[in-house]
């Protein structure tokens, strides 16, 4: 029983640390003079199936973390913290979008594999800047591959694509007044 308790405490501290790191990065991406509103978003089953088919990527968890970023009560962006499966372990990444649904920054928050960590390289991630729901996320065409990191490259690219799809959905729902 004690072991289970310690595992839960340890897992909770890891999640809190990842969320704290994500929020620090969000503040660096959007500036210090912004308001950040956190939402643990649980897509309904129909939405989840749609997102998985559209992005060709299954969700690892039932929820994702979403932040609405506002300045003077005006929405300026949405950030999404999500996980994709690398070769065998999750890759936790953050995608920051402007209010038009275009990516302004991406960041690998936690990379757990021994190989393929190059997907966390800022220069590689910068090629996604400006991508949105209508962008072509094809590896080798608009996105450079990384030798030795094929699985991670595909996973992160599909993850950012799914984030763009989610942001488009959230922006549309926000205009309608709800998620």
Predicted regions and their residues:
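Sec-dependent N-terminal signal peptides
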Residues: 3-13
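Flexible, solvent-exposed loop/hinge segments and secondary-structure transition points
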Residues: 17-143, 150, 154, 158-179
């Amino acid at each position: 029983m004690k072991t289970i308790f310690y595992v839960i405490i340890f897992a909770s501290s890891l999640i809190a640390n990842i969320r704290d790191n994500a929020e620090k990065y969000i503040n660096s991406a959007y500036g210090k003079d912004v308001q950040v509103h956190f939402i643990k978003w649980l897509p309904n089953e129909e939405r989840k199936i749609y997102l998985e088919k559209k992005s060709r990527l299954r969700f690892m968890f039932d929820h994702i973390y979403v932040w609405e970023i506002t300045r003077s009560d005006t929405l300026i962006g949405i950030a999404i913290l999500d996980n994709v499966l690398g070769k065998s372990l999750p890759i936790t990444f953050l995608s920051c979008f402007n209010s038009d649904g275009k990516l302004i920054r991406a960041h690998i928050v936690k990379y757990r594999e021994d190989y393929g960590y190059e997907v966390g390289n800022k220069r590689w991630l910068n090629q996604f800047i400006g991508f949105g729901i209508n962008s072509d996320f094809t590896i080798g065409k608009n996105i450079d591959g990384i030798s030795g990191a094929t699985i991670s490259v595909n996973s992160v690219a599909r993850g950012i694509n799914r984030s763009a799809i989610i942001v488009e959905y959230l922006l549309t729902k926000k205009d309608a007044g709800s998620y």
